[in-house]
């Protein structure tokens, strides 16, 4: 093996070999069961971020683990067409390169441009997935707009329409006035803003007065421009101030519209004056109030968010109301909503109807892609009536057919599903699945798989023009079919029978409603078991938290704190990193600040760590459901872990290759084999480690599974067992050396199989080198059997004896550290309180004590026999004493301790000064203050320890 571990030299070659040889494919033998995971399809034009790297590590660990357990595994890969994101990207590119809009090109030519863009950049994320070591079946790669999935989408739409679960209606949606499309709640970013609350006077009609004699009601609003569309003023039914006015009318200023005063529990009596203007066409809460009171909806905004020349009046059932007057003042027509706001407030002031303007903090909804304020808008859209499907989907989780890990996310799921609204599935875009609906010249709608099918079904002559709906489906609609459409539905259902329901879905909590819930509903509606029972899409939903930066902030381009997983794998120099973080920014004014923080945090850039170190770090940090603060130091630590494993393997191979390693090894001479206590102990410990690892994997505790591997490999195998082999390999009999060599190669080989799911590359490399020494067959570790716990291998005696030996060695090492005695200096130990078992252990393990503790002698003191001045350690009931005379230069040690005490005392005084400074405590973040306090506590402990040592030396001096 190479002297140093260099991941760059092994990873890509290995992956290419795995892929070419078809190791990622299902092997077809279902005797141990089938196992399937569907990758959440990333945006086709996107690139890998830390969230992807995290989830892909979890999924690949599960797939590799189950594959080695003998399961017929499929990790289904694919990408999402990401309607709005992709269309915007291509539109920006078109504008920059050709100075044209999509409308200049027309729909068909623009769509060709998008497909070209997809072909050019669509492979980026799949290349990056390969770099992460993802063992997906690339031959089955799908795309949400490929021919098969498009057919599935069409089929689902038509069937839902035929089942009366899809309809077209005029309802309130999140409208993006810049992109001219409805968007989902997930694409709306609510930002905290400091705005105003305008208090307006609404005159009472018909001479009515309030209880305190006023001829108006005072309403407070953050959006005075929408008052042109008010349909009512609401008060709480129990509010005594206004009870006499319920059912009376307001004369709405500026438009002179009579609107009713209605009673509704939605109103908070304690907030403001207890009177709320109701604008059902421009506010989601008001829309619900309007439905309850059957109020007409006055839509006063155009799709560009400007004031209309006259309001569109709509009934609560979505039909147009032609009897009510929707006229609006001419002076406002065409005015942008925010300019209209200023003009309307000015007019209220002129009319003497502006009570006051107060500062007010509020959440303003912005389009996460367009960056403009989103407008609740009444538009004609297609909807899925999801309530009937939601009932079955709720029951699937209630009865345990689907489990959430961690379980707390079930509550989030239930709260959403029990308050579910119809799903708006149409988008005013060009890139996406076009809605399979056609209109005749009278506006009558026909739904079918194709225009030909529509004409045949409804007997429409070719001479009659039909126009296909211009809208496309919400991206989440096709994603909702992901588990069954990718397996061949509706045409080919063989794979569906094999791999569905899938086993686990790995996803973030933020899309439980948008994706997870909709997959459950759609799958259970369309996929049934042979007995007709609705089939779930997956048995377990493993919910991950977000990966945040080291300070706990969400990673975002605008913050300049995004980390690219590939930069941690391959490394990146500082200048390239700065350019990457500050180039092509939406907000270029932030570039200088981002450059400064990047140069401070990564003054030498980021060094290459390799895929295995990154994967292991992500697994080790995967505590269920919690957000993770990224920690570069842990990544550095796990890179060192890879080095440790590499160097340990080199030690094993240097001592075993070309040697007799016992039965099954190529150089076995047929002699006897004797296992040392250390050999028996490591075999037992490895066996127990396998059991613990399996338990953690079964409960999706990847962090505990990773820590189990780390503890065994570094702390037990490397730090203890390899050291314990040295006395045997140097001075043992032939049978003992054969036994230790046999144990070394067999445990190392099995360790690679145990670690492989999390660290695929380094383990394959080491396994290929060590397997010939064990007689193990197989072309790749990927298909080798996963280690299994064997109750017959439990060796409690070896475990207890060796742990006792370790305690003795640790006690001696601690004494050396405390007294500053060189590790190479031989020591003589005295023992008191020695049991018969202790005595037997001492006699049997002299070689270990001589080599690892550098004990020249171990003398048992007789009863009542006194010992010279010694420093002691306890091992159970046995006392270990090291006579101190002649071991140390007492004066030099006392001087050293005094010097250390002085330094520590000064440091404590410095921190105390800091913490007593009121200015520092007031300004410093709590985390910084806690860190300083923890540092002071550590220093105090160090002072106590040194003071004790000084007292011991003082006794010697006396």
From Swiss-Prot:
Iron recorded as keyword: no
Pfam families cross-referenced by the UniProt entry: Anticodon_1, tRNA-synt_1, Val_tRNA-synt_C
Motif 'KMSKS' region, residue numbers: 554-558
Top-rank taxon, per record: Bacteria
GO CC aspect terms: cytosol
Keyword Nucleotide-binding assigned: yes
SUPFAM superfamilies linked to this entry: Anticodon-binding domain of a subclass of class I aminoacyl-tRNA synthetases (SSF47323), Nucleotidylyl transferase (SSF52374), tRNA-binding arm (SSF46589), ValRS/IleRS/LeuRS editing domain (SSF50677)
Subcellular compartments: Cytoplasm
Short motif ('HIGH' region): ranges: 42-52
Coiled coil, from the record: 887-956
Domain notes: ValRS has two distinct active sites: one for aminoacylation and one for editing. The misactivated threonine is translocated from the active site to the editing site.
PANTHER family: VALINE--TRNA LIGASE, CHLOROPLASTIC_MITOCHONDRIAL 2 (PTHR11946:SF93), VALYL-TRNA SYNTHETASES (PTHR11946)
Protein name in UniProt: Valine--tRNA ligase
Organism of derivation: Shewanella oneidensis (strain ATCC 700550 / JCM 31522 / CIP 106686 / LMG 19005 / NCIMB 14063 / MR-1)
């Amino acid at each position: 093996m190479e002297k140093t571990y260099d991941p760059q030299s092994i990873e890509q070659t290995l992956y290419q070999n795995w892929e070419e040889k078809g190791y990622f494919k299902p092997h077809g033998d279902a005797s141990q069961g089938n196992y399937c995971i569907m990758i959440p399809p990333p945006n086709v034009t996107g690139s890998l971020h830390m969230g992807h790297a995290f989830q892909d590590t979890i999924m690949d660990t599960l797939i590799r683990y189950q594959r080695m357990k003998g399961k017929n595994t499929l990790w289904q890969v694919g990408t999402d067409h990401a309607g709005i994101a992709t269309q915007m990207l291509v539109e920006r590119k078109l504008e920059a390169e050709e100075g044209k809009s999509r409308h200049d090109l027309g729909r068909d030519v623009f769509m060709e441009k998008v497909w070209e863009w997809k072909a050019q950049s669509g492979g980026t994320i799949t290349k990056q997935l390969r770099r992460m070591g993802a063992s997906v079946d690339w031959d089955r790669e799908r795309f949400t707009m490929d021919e098969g999935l498009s057919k599935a989408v069409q089929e689902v739409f038509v069937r839902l329409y035929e089942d009366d679960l899809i309809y077209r209606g005029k309802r309130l949606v999140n409208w993006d006035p810049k992109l001219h499309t409805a968007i989902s709640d997930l694409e709306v970013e609510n930002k905290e803003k400091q705005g105003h609350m305008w208090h307006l006077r609404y005159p009472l009609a018909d001479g009515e007065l309030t209880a305190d004699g006023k001829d108006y009601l005072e309403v407070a609003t953050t959006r005075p421009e929408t008052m042109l569309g008010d349909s009512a003023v609401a008060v709480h039914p129990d509010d005594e101030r206004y009870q006499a006015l319920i059912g009376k009318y307001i004369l709405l200023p500026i438009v002179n519209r009579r609107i009713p005063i209605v009673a509704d529990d939605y109103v908070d009596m304690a907030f403001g004056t207890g009177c709320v203007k109701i604008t059902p066409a421009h506010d989601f809460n008001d829309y619900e109030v309007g439905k309850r009171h059957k109020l007409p909806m006055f839509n006063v905004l155009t799709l560009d968010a400007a004031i209309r020349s006259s309001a569109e009046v709509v009934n609560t059932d979505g039909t147009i109301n032609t009897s009510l007057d929707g006229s609006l003042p001419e002076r406002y027509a065409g005015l942008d909503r925010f300019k209209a706001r200023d003009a309307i407030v000015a007019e209220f002031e002129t009319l003497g109807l502006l009570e006051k303007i107060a500062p007010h903090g509020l959440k303003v909804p912005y389009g996460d892609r367009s960056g403009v304020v989103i407008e609740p808008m009444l538009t004609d859209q297609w909807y899925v009536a999801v309530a009937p499907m939601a009932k079955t989907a709720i029951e699937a989780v209630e009865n345990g057919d689907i489990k959430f890990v961690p379980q707390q996310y079930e509550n989030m799921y239930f709260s959403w599903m029990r308050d579910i609204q119809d799903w708006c599935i149409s988008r005013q875009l060009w890139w996406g699945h076009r809605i399979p609906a056609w209109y005749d010249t009278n506006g009558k709608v026909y739904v079918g798989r194709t225009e030909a099918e529509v004409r045949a079904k409804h007997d429409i002559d070719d001479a009659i023009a039909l126009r296909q709906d211009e809208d496309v489906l919400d991206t989440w609609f096709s994603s909702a079919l992901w588990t069954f459409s990718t397996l061949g539905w509706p045409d080919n259902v063989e794979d569906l029978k094999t791999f569905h329901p899938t086993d686990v879905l790995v996803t973030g909590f933020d899309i439980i409603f948008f994706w997870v819930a909709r997959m459950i509903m759609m799958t259970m509606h369309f996929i049934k078991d042979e007995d007709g029972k609705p089939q779930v899409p997956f048995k377990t939903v493993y919910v991950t938290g977000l990966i945040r930066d080291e300070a706990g902030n969400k990673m975002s381009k605008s913050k300049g704190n995004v980390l690219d997983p590939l930069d941690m794998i391959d490394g990146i120099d500082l200048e390239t990193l700065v350019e990457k973080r500050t180039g092509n920014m939406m907000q270029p004014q932030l570039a200088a600040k981002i450059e400064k923080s990047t140069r401070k945090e990564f003054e030498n850039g980021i060094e290459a760590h390799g895929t295995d170190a990154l994967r292991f770090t992500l697994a080790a940090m995967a505590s269920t459901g919690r957000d993770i603060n990224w920690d570069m130091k842990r990544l550095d630590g796990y890179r060192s872990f890879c080095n440790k494993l590499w160097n340990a393997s080199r030690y094993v191979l240097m001592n075993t290759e070309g040697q007799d390693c016992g039965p099954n090894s190529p150089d076995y001479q047929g002699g006897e084999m004797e296992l040392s206590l250390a050999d028996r102990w490591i075999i037992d410990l490895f066996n127990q480690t396998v059991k613990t690892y399996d338990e953690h994997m079964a409960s999706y505790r990847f962090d505990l599974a990773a820590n189990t591997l780390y503890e065994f490999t570094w702390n037990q195998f490397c730090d203890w067992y390899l050291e314990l082999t040295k006395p045997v390999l140097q001075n043992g009999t032939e049978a003992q050396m054969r036994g230790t060599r046999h144990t070394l190669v067999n445990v190392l080989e099995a360790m690679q199989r145990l670690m492989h799911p999390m660290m695929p590359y380094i383990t394959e490399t080491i396994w290929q080198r060590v397997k010939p020494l064990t007689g193990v067959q197989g072309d790749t570790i990927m298909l080798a059997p996963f280690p299994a716990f064997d109750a017959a291998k439990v060796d409690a005696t070896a475990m207890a004896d060796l742990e006792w030996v370790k305690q003795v060695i640790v006690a001696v090492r601690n004494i050396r550290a405390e007294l500053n005695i060189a590790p190479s200096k031989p020591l003589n130990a005295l023992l008191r309180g020695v049991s018969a078992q202790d005595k037997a252990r001492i006699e049997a393990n002299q070689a270990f004590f001589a080599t690892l503790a550098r004990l020249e002698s171990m003398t048992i003191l007789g009863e009542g026999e006194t010992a010279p001045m010694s420093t002691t350690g306890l091992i159970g009931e046995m006392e270990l004493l090291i006579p101190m005379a002649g071991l140390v230069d007492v004066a030099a040690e006392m001087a050293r301790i005094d010097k250390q005490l002085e330094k520590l005392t000064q440091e404590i005084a410095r921190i105390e000064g800091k913490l007593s400074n009121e200015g520092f405590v007031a300004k410093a973040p709590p985390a910084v203050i806690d860190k300083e306090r923890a540092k002071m506590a550590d220093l105090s402990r160090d002072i106590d320890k040194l003071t004790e040592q000084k007292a011991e030396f003082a006794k010697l001096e006396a």
